[in-house]
Regions:
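ABC-family P-loop ATPase nucleotide-binding domain
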Residues: 1-12, 222-249
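ABC family nucleotide-binding domain
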Residues: 2-215
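H-loop (His-switch) and adjacent beta-strand-loop-beta switch element
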Residues: 212-225
Length: 249
């Protein structure tokens, strides 16, 4: 069943006296429970595509449906409600609040959603335990490894039970062992029914996923539907991990 449908999407940015087509006639369907990636070099349009899919922006033309709702011309308030109820985000830089502990970082989206304190606490604890960080619930981000911070970010992304999670270069700041742990966690989430879309420029990550959408010059270049290897090690080149990071993914 289609969760996301894009039909002839165009996104034009006006820069001075020029019109720049970031997306040029993109059509795409993503089904519920899919685990896929959007891959492409800088300037390919992949980030713009993620912004539209994540209801952070609207297209210049074309139609975009999320869970059957047309958001092509949605207002900022309508987009915000869609993000809060159906979409989760995981970022390369984690985007955690450094002065809040794990529990309160994960609770934050529910504060904006108006969820009661009791329900917030119950859902946050469940999400934290789902990513195996129950023993770190009262630590702040500065007391965690990079891999642990990313798992906190994932818990925060799933705490409102979204239909779809977008992950922007989620292993970009992690060593390969920790990156493998994060990729496995995403796969488990997809198997539970949550659609996972990873945005990356890394072919090694893309080759691990069941489907890849390759962007080039604002268009979809290749859609690979065939299953890829799910057992080969995740070979990624990342910065040297911080002390303790590899031992505590």
């Amino acid at each position: 069943m289609a969760l996301v449908e894009l039909r002839d999407i165009r996104k034009i940015y006006h820069v001075g006296d020029q019109d720049i087509a970031a997306l040029d006639g993109v059509s795409l369907t993503i089904d519920a429970g899919e685990f896929l990636c959007i891959i492409g070099p800088s300037g390919s349009g992949k980030s713009t595509l993620m912004h539209l899919l994540g209801c952070l922006d609207t297209p210049t033309s074309g139609s975009l449906l999320i869970d059957g709702v047309d958001v092509s011309n949605a207002t900022d308030d309508q987009l915000s409600r869609m993000r809060n109820s159906k979409i989760g985000f995981v970022f390369q830089a984690f985007n955690l609040l450094p002065k809040l502990d794990v529990l309160h970082n994960v609770e934050l989206p529910m504060v904006y959603a108006g969820v009661s304190a009791k329900v917030r606490r119950e859902r946050a604890i469940a999400a934290i335990e789902r990513v195996d960080l129950g023993h770190r619930m009262y630590n702040t981000p500065l007391q965690l490894s990079g891999g642990q911070c990313q798992r906190v970010a994932i818990a925060r992304a799933i705490v409102n039970n979204p239909k779809i999670v977008f992950a922007d270069e989620p292993t970009g700041n992690l060593d390969s062992k920790t990156g493998e742990t994060i990729l496995t966690l995403f796969r488990e989430l997809a198997e539970s029914g949550c659609t996972i879309v990873i945005v990356t420029h890394d072919n090694n990550i893309a080759s691990r996923l069941p489907r890849r959408i390759e962007m080039r010059d604002g268009r979809i270049r290749v859609g690979v539907e065939a299953a890829k290897s799910q057992t080969a090690p995740l070979l990624v080149s990342h910065p040297t991990p911080q002390k303790g990071e590899e031992a505590q993914p």
